[in-house]
A protein has these predicted regions:
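Juxtamembrane membrane-water interface segments of multi-pass membrane proteins
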Residues: 98-115, 135-141, 171-186, 204-213, ...
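An N-terminus-focused feature that recognizes amino-terminal "leader" regions
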Residues: 75, 82-91, 117
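Membrane-interface interhelical loops and short amphipathic "cap" helices
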Residues: 34-83, 134-153, 204-221, 270
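Hydrophobic secretory-pathway targeting helix
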Residues: 1-33
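Hydrophobic cores of alpha-helical transmembrane segments in multi-pass inner/ER membrane proteins
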Residues: 89-99, 122, 156-172, 225-239, ...
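Transmembrane alpha-helical segments of multi-pass membrane proteins
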Residues: 14, 114-127, 182-198, 251-263
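Membrane-interface helix-loop-helix modules in multi-pass inner-membrane proteins
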Residues: 124-172, 200-207
């Protein structure tokens, strides 16, 4: 199944990298499995306000305590981390699409170039698997299992990363001819559509400040656009791999959807 000795070594190396990542995640110290996460600060002196009857014509608006410099610095770092991850993923999506569109020309000189677009997906998936959500051990104070079972956003990010890795693996196997069954043509589209559907329900926390609500709405709208482009990739890729007459057209169309998705990811802001 894995072809030549060189191909076999590459697959073994990739499997060992993923295994090493999971070993590091799952070997977190005991204290990270039940981290002491401080609750949100209470509003001093306002105890019992919930029990007071409503007063006609009076709207109670209690200002939250001002965040400390440390909290502000952490919020800014999280924002930059999230935006960087989106931008990197976008750049790799664009690069993957361009490699696919140019693969015939490139592979005539460098045969291995036909795997370049799949390698971009693999790299994006592995990077996000490791570096998204740095509150997870070994970068932070939460174990992998605690984070993905207590924070829906973390669980979704790791799922997106796993989907990218799976897309890269499937693309590599089909490009090499190791995966030939008729059903294998649907793996990539189904995975891509699953990722696009998840974006419709993506939980995104950590919004702060007076414009938090507007920021959340803007982020949700961006996710909707990501989902639309991702669905376009899925449908066009499925048709490219299964339709004979229209295959050349859809083989050009689905990378264009991927480029559109990549551009939107590059423009992502919080």
């Amino acid at each position: 199944m894995f072809g030549t000795g060189r191909e076999r070594m590459l697959w073994i190396a990739g499997a060992l990298v993923l295994l090493a990542i999971m070993v590091v995640f799952l070997s977190a110290p005991a204290w990270t499995r039940h981290p002491n996460i401080p609750p949100q600060p209470a509003m001093s002196g306002m105890e019992g306000m919930d029990d007071m009857p409503d007063m006609p014509g009076m709207h109670m608006e209690v200002a939250a305590p001002a965040p400390t410099p440390e909290v502000l610095a952490k919020q800014l770092a999280d924002k930059r981390e999230s935006e960087f991850n989106h931008h990197l993923a976008g750049a790799l999506m664009i690069l993957a699409a361009l490699f696919f569109l140019a693969q015939d020309r490139l592979s005539s000189r460098w045969p291995s170039a036909r795997y370049a677009w799949a390698a971009c997906l693999l790299f994006a998936g592995v990077f996000l698997l490791v570096f998204s959500d740095t509150e997870i051990w070994p970068f932070g104070y939460q174990s992998f299992l605690y984070a993905v079972t207590h924070n829906p956003e973390d669980a979704q990010h790791k799922t997106f990363a796993a989907i990218l890795v799976a897309l890269g693996v499937v693309a590599t196997l089909r490009t090499s001819g190791r995966l030939r069954g008729w059903w294998s043509a649907w793996i990539f589209p189904v995975l891509a559509l699953a990722g696009a559907t998840m974006l419709l329900f993506h939980h995104h926390g950590g919004m702060h400040g007076p414009d938090a609500m507007q920021t959340m709405v803007r982020v949700q709208h961006q996710h909707l656009r990501f989902a639309g482009a991702g669905a376009g990739v899925a449908v066009a890729k499925g048709l490219a791999d299964t339709s004979g007459k229209w295959q050349p057209f859809f083989n050009k169309l689905w990378p264009l959807f991927m480029i559109a998705l990549g551009v939107m990811l590059l423009m992502y802001t919080e």
